[in-house]
Amino acid sequence: MAHIYIALVDTPGFFASLIRHYLGQKYVHVVLSLDEQLSEAYSFGRRNPYIPLIAGFEREWSRQIAGAFPTAEYRICELDCTGEQKEAIRERLHKDYKNRFHMHYAAAGLLALLCHRKFYLKNQYTCSSYLAEVLGEQGIFISEKHFSLVTPKAVSYTHLRAHETGAYL
């Protein structure tokens, strides 16, 4: 049995506080990682941790994130998968990373999410909609909702083993 890891993050900051307020949840950001230390982790979010308005698909660098958000809280979840599923996810992450400047954060998707409306434009995602789509393509469903409606709160913890940490690993 292989594993992938999902980090749910309580990101500080003005934009995150708006999302937290309107969605009513503690964790407002998700990261998909191939290892427990999050050394190979990807997400849709800030291209630079200090500039919230420029966002897209990025590899998350733990030292840079920890420096920008030293008070952030994390919930690291382990998800069982097959070796074939993990390899397919790895290939998708690497392919998308090569094309990262053609992939954008779906800011309009946040508005649709607030209205409970499905939303998709090619290569535009929120962090949690990307996670749901990538996993769903491999038959790993973290929510019964359409991928564009998945939020960090919608991730079902019942099949995830998790621990909380106050520091980015």
What label would you give each PLM region?
Residues 2-4:
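Extreme N-terminal starter segment of soluble prokaryotic enzymes
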Residues 150-156:
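Beta-rich nucleic-acid/ligand-interaction surfaces
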Residues 15-22, 70-148:
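Active-site nucleophile-His-acid catalytic modules used for acyl/amide transfer and hydrolysis
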